[in-house]
Amino acid sequence: MKEKNNKEIVYLLVCLVVVTLIYLLNHFTLYTSDDFVYRFIYKEPFPSDNEQPVRSLFDLITSQMNHWKVWNGRFTGHSIVQIFMQYNKEVFNVFNSSVFLSLGILIDSLSFEIVSNKHRKHQVLYLAIIFLILWWFLPEIGKTVLWISGSGNYLWTAVLDLLWLKVVLRRNQSPYNILWTIPLAFFSGAGNENTSPAFILLISLIILYDAVSEKRVSVSRVLEIVAAC
């Protein structure tokens, strides 16, 4: 019991160190480039006269509809960016640091779920290694994790993708989960043109595997794929 408590304390310390360091980096990362465009209802790629701030859900939807027509359909990522651009930067710093922490924890959790649980005693070490790998190998971490416009499109959508995958891999779920897994799949599918199609394909293959190996097809999973597409 004592050994278990010590591991939990070390685990929490690793998480605290990571979230603190990422918060500090977020704190010193300023607004730049696209951030200023997403402060307002989107009309065109560059700021112009008579810009209108996003003041309501209707404004946000209008902005994203314009964005879809003019630029691209990254509804999820740019909605996240526009929401945070209406508040003090510190609000984003706190949430973004937590989301980066969630990315590492999800990768750790999925790796054990997919491969094996027998090495759980080394979980703290694995988690620390995961964050070191993320630090060294994430492409342009300043643009994909710290910059608001980049983080909303890459970090946040990656977490949604992994969360959806984790839900799919779980068995014996409550039928009521569909109330939140379908919206989750929708927002994951509306992430970006790189990871969204890849995860839709991956989860479609998982559904196909279940259909062949276990002679069953989950209706909720099929509905999730439809929502994501």
Language model features by range: what are they?
Residues 1-22, 123:
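Start-transfer (signal-anchor) and selected internal transmembrane alpha helices
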Residues 22-69, 81-82:
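Extracytoplasmic loop-helix module adjacent to an early transmembrane segment
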Residues 66-90, 94:
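Short hydrophobic/aromatic helix or loop-helix immediately within or flanking a transmembrane segment
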Residues 97-121, 125, 163:
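Transmembrane-helix motifs of polytopic, lipid-linked glycan transferases
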Residues 122-169, 192:
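Membrane-interface micro-motifs in multi-pass membrane enzymes
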Residues 161-178, 213-216:
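Membrane-interface transmembrane helices that cradle and orient dolichyl/undecaprenyl
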Residues 177-202:
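Membrane-interface alpha helices of multi-pass inner-membrane proteins
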Residues 198-228:
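Perimembrane helix-loop-helix junctions
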